[in-house]
């Protein structure tokens, strides 16, 4: 059956700021306390979406979350009105305020893991929400992510959205950022590659930075998504690269159809994995980048592998890259050599995503890939699909509500909370989502 990959990109939230919340993510740590520009950030993301949609790649949007997230502060023992809570936490525990104001839901590669209908035992599209329990600020996301996905993928005859795994370390799940699908045509059955950093009785794990994904979680997600057991491979990421800042597999590898583009040091038993894929995926091609041409540290600094690999109508592939790759002489030299060689990657497109990149999120972090047949695509909430009208409306919405300068101190401003809630209220109507946010359900829009 004919199917296409649709990229659902996360809209950057109104509280996008640099707090260094993500240990193991070196860009996040390096840019801590810098001044951010939320309006520029959301517009950089919108420009990427629109350019790819105009080039013929189906594109949709996933909204940001409510931030600052007052219910989490109430759970932590802060009391009073919303404004009083903001004041108290800013004075007593500013780190908590930064955590509950994180715009990290924009990196929707961590929102869920997706199984196309061609791979599922019941013939439905499955999405399992990620629990993201390695970081407090990300562990807050799952309930609203689930509500948003249910509002986008409403038709239960076509889609199954599963709640996140239990919030325990044993079942740490980071979503599609640790998942690749390889195969031929999108509508044909593929091989799903789940990548983990640790498993309970395996002592091979990183020493410096945490391994966020467990094998136990990957196996549970594969079961929930009803992936045909004959079409699954579980592989461990190289713990040494995790310790060099590769906190998700999509920082060191990206796949599309029959191609796996990765660093030669990406996986723990890479030769074995490559041979497995070669026997199970027709026409499989591994493009392994040698350390002699691009070091792991340069790959992390430029996010070479946090790129999008997209199929064009003629069968060739486009590599969508952050500007940092172009700015690095060695990486850019390698890339120009790559597209000149005999492989499906024949073109590159560079985007300026510096606001997201400074927090450790490149092009691939910002998107959730969902393979859909024409019938399934028609069943998606049409209001989230990118087109000229939506692009214009979202830019006007951003101009109205987003600030062009934000510091950690600004997070305590009760006006920012009100602006955010009003903006999301408008956005849910624009995208026909219903009342997906807690403030809409409790009638707390006025604080």
UniProtKB/Swiss-Prot annotation:
GO molecular function: N-succinylarginine dihydrolase activity
SUPFAM superfamilies recorded: Pentein
Gene expressing this chain: astB
List of catalytic residues: 174, 248, 365 (nucleophile)
Protein name, as recorded: N-succinylarginine dihydrolase
GO biological process, one term: arginine catabolic process to succinate
Top enzyme category: hydrolase
Keyword Nucleotide-binding: no
Binding site for substrate: 19-28, 110, 137-138, 212, 250, 359
Provenance organism: Salmonella heidelberg (strain SL476)
Associated pathway: Amino-acid degradation; L-arginine degradation via AST pathway; L-glutamate and succinate from L-arginine: step 2/5
Function description: Catalyzes the hydrolysis of N(2)-succinylarginine into N(2)-succinylornithine, ammonia and CO(2).
HAMAP family: AstB
Catalytic activity: N(2)-succinyl-L-arginine + 2 H2O + 2 H(+) = N(2)-succinyl-L-ornithine + 2 NH4(+) + CO2
Oligomeric form and interacting partners: Homodimer.
């Amino acid at each position: 059956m004919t199917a296409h990959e649709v990229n659902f990109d996360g809209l950057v939230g109104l509280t996008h700021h640099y707090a260094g919340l993500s240990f193991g993510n070196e860009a996040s740590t390096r840019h801590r306390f810098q001044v951010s520009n939320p309006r520029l950030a959301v517009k950089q993301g919108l420009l990427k979406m629109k350019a790819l949609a105009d080039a013929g790649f189906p594109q949709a949007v996933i909204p940001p979350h409510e931030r600052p997230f007052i219910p989490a502060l109430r759970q932590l023992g802060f009391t009073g009105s919303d404004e009083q809570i903001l004041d108290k936490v800013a004075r007593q525990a500013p780190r908590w305020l930064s955590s509950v104001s994180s715009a990290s839901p924009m990196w929707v590669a961590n929102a869920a893991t997706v199984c196309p209908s061609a791979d599922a035992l019941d013939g439905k599209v499955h999405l399992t929400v990620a629990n993201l329990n390695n970081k407090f600020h990300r562990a807050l996301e799952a309930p609203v992510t689930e509500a948003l996905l249910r509002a986008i993928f409403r038709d239960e005859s076509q889609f199954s959205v599963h709640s996140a795994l239990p919030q325990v370390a044993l079942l740490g799940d980071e979503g599609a950022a640790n998942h690749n699908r390889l195969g031929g045509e999108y509508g044909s059955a593929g091989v799903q590659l789940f990548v983990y950093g640790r498993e309970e009785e395996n002592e091979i794990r990183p020493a410096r930075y945490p391994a966020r994904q467990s094998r136990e979680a990957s196996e549970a997600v594969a079961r929930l998504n009803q992936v045909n057991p004959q079409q699954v491979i579980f592989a461990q990421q190289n713990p040494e690269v995790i310790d060099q800042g590769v906190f998700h597999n999509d920082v060191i590898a990206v796949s599309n159809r029959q191609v796996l583009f990765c660093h030669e040091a990406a996986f723990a038993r890479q030769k074995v994995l490559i041979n497995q894929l070669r026997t199970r995926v027709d026409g499989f091609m591994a493009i392994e980048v040698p350390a002699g041409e691009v070091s792991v540290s340069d790959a992390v600094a430029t996010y070479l592998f946090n790129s999008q690999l997209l199929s064009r109508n003629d069968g060739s592939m486009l590599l969508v890259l952050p500007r940092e790759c172009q700015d690095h002489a060695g990486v850019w030299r390698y890339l120009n050599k790559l597209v000149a060689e005999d492989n499906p990657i024949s073109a590159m497109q560079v985007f300026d995503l510096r606001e997201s990149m400074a927090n450790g999120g490149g092009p691939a972090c910002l998107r959730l890939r969902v393979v859909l047949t024409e019938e399934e695509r028609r069943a998606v909430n049409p209001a989230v699909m990118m087109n000229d009208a939506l692009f214009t409306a979202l830019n006007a919405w951003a101009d109205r509500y987003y600030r062009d300068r934000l510091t950690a101190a600004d997070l305590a401003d009760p006006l920012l909370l009100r602006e955010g809630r009003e903006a999301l209220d408008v956005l849910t109507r624009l995208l026909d989502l219903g009342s997906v946010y807690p403030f809409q359900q409790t009638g707390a829009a006025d604080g």
